[in-house]
Amino acid sequence: MSRLQQLQAFLAQDPNDSFTRYAIGLEYAKAQDYTAAIRTLEELRTIDADYVPTYLMLGGYYREVNDTANAEAIYKEGLLRARKSSDLHAASELQAALDELDDQ
């Protein structure tokens, strides 16, 4: 059983587990299936909008498919949520990603 299959089995047992859904998105991206990665992290964003790690990765995956408009919107939303939850490290990473996007 692959890591992705294991994670999917875990998610089937607990569909509300944000970390597992996030990890599935990362596995798809690892396989360069950015469409599936984006779909998975968008689902996570709908289910648990306050799961801050989602935003940096999701924005990056939008960049991988050359969708800079969505990447920018995701980074900005993540920045707001990170600040709201006082996650200064995530806010810093999201701001850096946004700045890098603006420099392109």
Describe each model-derived feature in a short phrase:
Residues 9-12, 43-46, 80:
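Conserved structural position within tetratricopeptide repeats
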